[in-house]
């Protein structure tokens, strides 16, 4: 049985807060012990963490391509149920995609420990936490062994406490598109000078242009025929190339109930 969204949020709060408090001094001590061996190099093996949002896994693509253009090998950690979204644009090599199975608490714990081992095996040196509110990803960021850890921080504002395990803290800007906020995280990862806070840059609309998904022509043709058949069964006039199709997703799942259509808005 899959873990519900509400259960995840409850666990993230009641378990995440004490774990962040425990992990914070441990991460600080490890940073202190490894400081004499630190090398001031640019990110070589860069991991993005975005577990629960399939849409964000697509919107972060321009940021990932920017990291690649800067010479980094990119990796991605995501929930197993959302991993298919990364295959649409194929920016991340399949062997560089790490997954966590959230279908049960035991699988979640096992895959988490397995990831922490893998992160060290692959010698991940930089990690970017794309999440805004998750303490779980904050813990993964702090404990994965990366020396350079980038993510959003509340600074002097009020909000969710996720510990202080980031080495490069970025201010989230709610007035710009999330894709631009992702670009600011990559800028912070590669910045040669410290900023407080990161990232004081201007990001153009051209920098967040999304690549087009490559779709198998046979699959596309099959779907077109299926849509025409369904339209014919419903006695709706439709022919590919003659009428347009509008896709609407009225159910945004339990992650964002605010995006759902109200039940009274549906037609019988």
Name these PLM-found stretches:
Residues 1-268:
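Catalytic machinery of carbohydrate-active enzymes
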